[in-house]
Design a protein with these regions (language model features):
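A short acidic, amphipathic alpha-helical/loop segment
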Residues: 18-22, 49, 77, 102-104
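Short, acidic/glycine-rich phosphate-metal binding loop used to engage nucleotide
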Residues: 64-71
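Active-site acidic Asp-centered loop
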Residues: 38, 90-92
Length: 207
């Protein structure tokens, strides 16, 4: 059983460098890292780093295409590049826990399920009550936004399972689905600055 860690990236240089470095150390040798780079909006700095990764890390694949403002189509393009039995889709500015990566092969081998929803810890530095009220968010006493914020991330590489929706995309075509427990060590970590969050929300409103 092989896992494809599938990543989309545009201009997140510091984030993609940290993610690939950590993921390459945590994953098994037989699992692959697959990166889809937005050559239309991405930076030369990120592309140069990705080319460096091809010689620095084993079992990594890099592809450049143009993002056309449709997130489901973009993730379906990423699907086509993967060769694993399962795909773990990760955004460039996210980080999976070491416990999750260590245990994922066993979880997948012992549970015959099409999709696993992954809880996500979101934090936004600079977040104010004005932002919280405007976006109708929930923030707990740890500063986690909308926790457990389950994400569609781990799924079988099956032709009938595909992404849909231009934004806030979800998977369709699956027969079974389950959730990881809403505990920190099973989570993706997603830390942002308020400036980036505002820009992202404004962009989503245009789609």
């Amino acid at each position: 059983m092989k896992i494809s860690y599938a990543i989309t990236v545009c201009n997140e240089f510091d984030e993609i460098r940290r993610l690939i470095d950590n993921l390459s150390q945590m994953k098994r040798d037989e699992d692959e890292i697959v990166v889809l780079f937005d050559k239309g909006g991405g930076t030369a700095k990120v592309w140069s780093y990705l080319q460096f990764c091809l010689s620095e890390y084993k079992n990594i694949k890099i592809e450049a295409q143009t993002f056309k403002n449709h997130f489901a189509d973009w993730k379906n393009e990423l699907f086509e590049l993967c060769t694993g039995d399962y795909i773990f889709q990760i955004d460039a500015d996210e980080m999976p826990s070491e416990i999750l990566i260590d245990n994922l092969p066993t979880i997948l081998e012992t549970n015959d399920v099409d999709v696993i929803m992954v809880p996500r810890i979101n934090t936004v530095e600079g977040l104010t009550n004005e932002h919280i009220n405007r976006w109708k968010w929930r923030v707990d006493d740890k500063g986690y936004v909308n926790f457990p914020d389950y994400q569609w991330r781990i799924y079988k590489r099956d032709e009938k399972i595909r992404w849909k929706n231009k934004v806030h995309e979800v998977l369709e075509g699956h027969d079974s689905i389950t959730n990881l427990p809403p505990e920190d060590h099973w989570c993706l970590r997603h830390d942002k600055q308020i400036e980036k969050q505002v820009k992202q929300n404004d962009y989503y409103d245009t789609l």
